[in-house]
A protein has these predicted regions:
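Active-site rim loops that border cofactor/substrate pockets in soluble metabolic enzymes
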Residues: 114-118, 122-126, 200-205
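Short, catalytically relevant binding-site loops at active-site mouths
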Residues: 76, 122-125, 160-163
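Conserved, well-structured core segments that form the ligand-binding/active-site neighborhood
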Residues: 1-122
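Short acidic, glycine/serine/threonine-rich loops at helix termini
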Residues: 14-19, 79-84, 127-131, 166-168, ...
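C-terminal non-catalytic interaction/assembly regions of soluble proteins
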Residues: 131-278
């Protein structure tokens, strides 16, 4: 009898090191369930990268770990690579796979925008509800960076699969009454108790519908370069950014860029009679 680990390897959302999200962290935090996660998270984030390796190696020395299956995903949330690793290879190969994952994960191909609108966040999308390596909204900017720089972020809803856990909503400035009505505190708060990132659970400004939420964010961007041509990006979630919506103010940035294909003529956002997009 023994343990075979199975996990995807990807950049972590709140620390950087040789082992980030993957098999080593799964042993340190995942297999330890709530207690394991809590015992690591309640120590300084500055040494998180060291703890993950320490805990992982200790578990391999004391538990019958037979090996692991590592998966890397591509930018379209599909499988890019599957690799079987012996316990020794978890130590030597996982850091190399992590480096590959940095190249294969999705990125919004812009440095910055005024407003980022995210239709839905959820634990099935990212541990933080939305992946900061895409959204640029890191739990601990002191230890991590990347993604797009948006002056304001709007989150419109949570996924059905997250069962009311709205962790990550606190990373936005504006949200909707719909999201807050669907948020279950008893599903959301235990995550914060475990990981200590209590600001992930904060409630942003609540607007009655999607239109008002987006309008508020657009009104409140003092750093915008051109207030008549605001730069806004709308994505369904951070895992699916192959097709995105951009405002006309961003058209000059994509017109001559071979990485973009313009799929439609400009159109108005399709708000329904209640001011919502869905």
């Amino acid at each position: 009898h023994g343990i075979i680990l199975y996990n995807r390897i990807k950049p972590h959302t709140s620390f950087r090191g040789p082992y980030e999200s993957g098999l080593m962290k799964m042993m340190a935090i995942g297999l330890g369930k709530q207690h394991g996660a809590e015992s690591i998270h309640h120590q300084s984030p500055a040494i998180m990268h060291e703890l993950v390796e320490e805990y992982g190696r200790t578990i391999m020395e004391n538990a019958p770990v037979l090996g692991g299956i590592a998966i890397i995903e591509n930018a379209y949330d599909d499988t890019y690579l599957i690799k079987g690793l012996s316990p020794e290879e978890i130590i030597t190969e996982e850091p190399k796979l992590k480096e590959i994952s940095y190249k294969t994960i999705a990125h919004l191909l812009f440095d910055k925008c005024d407003v980022l609108v995210v239709d839905k966040i959820g634990k099935n999308i990212s541990g933080d509800g939305m992946d900061p390596n895409v959204s640029g909204r890191f739990v601990q900017p002191k230890y991590c960076s990347g993604g797009i720089q948006a002056e304001k972020c709007v989150i419109l809803d949570i996924t059905d699969e997250t069962h009311g856990n709205a962790q990550g909503v606190g990373l936005a400035e504006v949200t909707t009454r719909r999201l807050v009505n669907r948020m279950k505190l008893e599903m959301t708060y235990p995550t914060g108790v475990t990981n200590t990132f209590l600001h992930l659970m904060k409630i942003p400004m609540i607007m009655d519908n999607d239109r008002e939420a987006i309008q508020l964010a657009l009104m409140c961007c003092p750093e915008a370069e051109d207030h008549d041509h605001m730069k806004m990006i709308r994505i369904p979630n951070t895992a699916h950014i192959g097709v995105i919506e951009i405002s006309e103010g961003m058209l000059p940035l994509v017109k001559n860029n071979p990485n973009f294909e313009i799929l439609t003529e400009p159109y108005d956002l399709p708000f329904d009679e209640n001011g919502n997009l869905f």
